[in-house]
Amino acid sequence: MDAAWRGGVGCSPVCLDLCVGLSPVREPSAARHELLDRPAGCRGGGDSKSMTNDEAKIVEAKVTQMSEENRRLTEVIARLYGGQIPRLGLDGSASPPRPVSPLSGKKRSRESMETANSCDANSNRHQGGDADHAESFAADDGTCRRIKVSRVCRRIDPSDTSLVVKDGYQWRKYGQKVTRDNPSPRAYFRCAFAPSCPVKKKVQRSAEDSSLLVATYEGEHNHPHPSPRAGELPAAAGGAGGSLPCSISINSSGPTITLDLTKNGGAVQVVEAAHPPPPPDLKEVCREVASPEFRTALVEQMASALTSDPKFTGALAAAILQKLPEF
């Protein structure tokens, strides 16, 4: 304690009142009131021991009061904090925020700046090129409408793996792959006149019948059909009809000529009569082959050969199914 208090010299008391506005839990002792109500000159005249006891009681009362106030404040703060946790969506299981490295922060800022610049450039380009975009879209629409897709079925030997469909045009193979819905691979061809000719062809065996070869054509040729070389006219006709065997006889005032189309390779075999006539005129033969009568006879002969083929019905049904749209 202070020396002035020990010596009994009268002096002004030290005020230790730390009231913070909350009501005390209990009233201070009567000794404290009595000591505080005494005049300043009369406090130092008592016994030193009794004064020390009174001061100790006063300090104890103040400490008890402050402890109770602290306890009340702690309860109020805990109650307020507990009420704010549900509103802020915080809970004890939330993981602490991970530290962000400066490199990732720089990278994110750089990406955000690039995104902003690209958005500005796109907006300017969009404002300046609406007309061009509309024209190009219309042109693309027209191109899509002009694309023609057709399918052709050919019956082949199941052991043949060449995936070649002879249609009179020259093609260049540029790829082959296996599709998901068909175990047979699909071959991709371009017209030999590419890139000026945009026609493409896809050839693949039918998934239902391995003896059917399905060729899908995309686009139209912008060049005339290549003229067949000598001796390939019947081969082209046979390829258009599915390479079916047929024989045609032409009866005219001239010598009798038989065209045998049953030979493999499509070669024309001229069979002379029993009495060999004089050599025929080549121009006359070509004129007869190009005549409408020859074409009519060829069509009739091919039709009869198709109807007599037991597999023709199955091939025709498969071709019709290929043409029908998928529902």
Curated annotation (Swiss-Prot):
Chief location: nucleus
Coiled-coil portions: 56-76
Keywords: Coiled coil, DNA-binding, Nucleus, Transcription, Transcription regulation
Presence of keyword DNA-binding: yes
A single cellular component GO annotation: nucleus
Induction comment from the UniProt entry of this chain: Induced by biotic elicitors (e.g. fungal chitin oligosaccharide). Induced by pathogen infection (e.g. M.grisea and X.oryzae pv. oryzae (Xoo)). Accumulates after treatment with benzothiadiazole (BTH) and salicylic acid (SA).
Superkingdom of this protein's organism: Eukaryota
Region (Disordered) residue spans: 87-135
Extent of Polar residues compositional bias: 114-126
Transmembrane segments: none
InterPro entries given in the database record: WRKY_dom, WRKY_dom_sf, WRKY_plant
SUPFAM superfamilies xrefs: WRKY DNA-binding domain (SSF118290)
Residue numbers covered by motif Nuclear localization signal: 106-112
GO biological process, one term: response to salicylic acid
A molecular function GO annotation: DNA-binding transcription factor activity
Residues making up the signal peptide according to the UniProt record: none
Compartment(s): Nucleus
DNA-binding region boundaries: 160-226
Free-text comment on this protein's domains from its UniProt entry: The WRKY domain is required to bind DNA.
Functional note: Transcription repressor. Interacts specifically with the W box (5'-(T)TGAC[CT]-3'), a frequently occurring elicitor-responsive cis-acting element. Regulates, probably indirectly, the activation of defense-related genes during defense response. Modulates plant innate immunity against X.oryzae pv. oryzae (Xoo).
Family that this chain belongs to: Belongs to the WRKY group II-a family.
Entry protein name: WRKY transcription factor WRKY76
Lineage: Eukaryota, Viridiplantae, Streptophyta, Embryophyta, Tracheophyta
